[in-house]
């Protein structure tokens, strides 16, 4: 199973829909940078509590070279920056999990393998850990996660779930 470095948004939204444990079932090691931990726990909500409840499988990792953070901070959040730096410092990380488009583009430019929360849900369905992706995407939207109609349909199709015949 792959090792992953996860940003705050995937942790928060997977926690909000009760699916944070999918990370443990899909990936051998889950690492979050200190900045991500700080972002998630800035307000003490259920996402923060769930991370604190899972100390055995969510590891808080510190980046080695703090000076690299300045290169990316103009357009990215501290957690996203640390995810990318940590992935570059630790070549054993197989994947980074980010939801922000600018962060994903930057990570890909750096040669990192990237997925997002929807990719995690698709992988979970392919591995029969969840029955359907569509109801979970609807829960994400209800919790404030923005998904365009095109992306919604693309993910639904990739999951092999029925698209309506007419729009």
Model-found features: residue ranges?
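Active-site-proximal, substrate-binding regions of enzyme catalytic domains
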Residues: 2-95, 101, 109-112, 154, ...
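Acidic, PIN/NYN-like endoribonuclease modules and their adjacent C-terminal/linker elements
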Residues: 104-167
